[in-house]
């Protein structure tokens, strides 16, 4: 403690280690701090887990963008829901199956703030934005009715569950008001079953085509290379089928085997070899 006495106001150098500096004598303060860790719910300590923490009410979380100066000309990342009702084996969101929503009145107030600020792009990070149809429709209706002619909104959706009234509303949007990111990942039926994905590929194609006919929304379709039961030939078929839909952008990613996911538990079963450190990307298959 002698070496750090009188330096509590100085910030430690940034590295991978968490620093705690006690002001003046740290003997008692340090002991109290360590003892208190065990009383904090939701921590994983060397001695084991502390008591579980209740899921956070999203409406109680603070709004982070009151001061927009640090975010000038930057993409704004915004969240109105957490959790996902689907069980995609590569995704950590599948662990939290209970979908929680931020109160819609709060969401509308915050969206209006972004619109008033003429933010260039607001990117929703909700895992499946339209899994709650009422919530999605209220937000889409709001940005349609309050469009400022400048702001673009990005949504990650499941296209095959879009309803007719949702498609009709999207077709009325100003060109550039919204863009949709649609995860296809694979069109191989065996792969889709293996990754626990619920998706009607034929219906997805028709809905993407219906949105495309409106010529007003940028559609960004995703594929993942390296999924179970997907080889070069079958992946090529997935690529050709998605390319034929004519999305404005086709994004190819490589499978990431995230710790805690179903895919991580069964990677050896599928012969998947991957990086043990971030980004945990697949690097090959066992021969």
Model-derived regions: residue spans:
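Hydrophobic/aromatic residues located in beta-strands of well-ordered beta-sheets
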Residues: 40-41, 122, 153, 180, ...
């Amino acid at each position: 403690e002698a070496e750090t006495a009188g330096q509590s106001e100085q910030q430690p150098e940034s590295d991978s280690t968490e620093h705690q500096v006690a002001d003046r004598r740290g003997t008692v303060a340090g002991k109290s701090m360590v003892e208190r860790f065990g009383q904090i719910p939701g921590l994983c300590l060397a001695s084991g887990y502390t008591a579980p923490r209740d899921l956070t009410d999203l409406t109680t979380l603070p709004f982070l963008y009151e001061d927009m100066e640090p975010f000038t000309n930057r993409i704004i990342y915004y969240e109105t829901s957490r959790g996902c009702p689907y069980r995609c084996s590569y995704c950590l969101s599948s662990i939290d199956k209970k979908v929680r929503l931020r109160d819609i009145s709060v969401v509308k107030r915050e969206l209006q703030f972004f619109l008033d600020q003429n933010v260039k792009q607001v990117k929703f990070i909700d895992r499946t934005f339209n899994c709650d149809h009422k919530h999605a429709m209220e937000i889409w209706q709001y940005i349609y009715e309050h469009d400022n002619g400048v702001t673009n909104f990005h949504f990650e959706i499941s296209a095959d569950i879009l309803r007719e009234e949702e498609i009709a509303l999207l077709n009325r949007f100003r060109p550039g008001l919204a863009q949709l990111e649609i995860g296809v990942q694979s069109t191989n039926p065996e792969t889709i079953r293996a990754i626990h994905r619920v998706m009607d590929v034929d219906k997805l194609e028709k809905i993407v085509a219906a949105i495309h006919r409106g010529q007003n929304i940028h559609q960004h379709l995703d594929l993942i290379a390296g999924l179970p039961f997907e080889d070069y030939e079958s992946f090529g078929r997935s690529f050709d089928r998605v390319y034929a839909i004519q999305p404005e952008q086709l994004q190819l990613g490589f499978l990431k085997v995230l710790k805690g996911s179903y895919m991580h538990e069964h990677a050896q079963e599928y012969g998947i070899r991957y990086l043990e450190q971030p980004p945990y990307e697949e690097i090959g298959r066992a021969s």
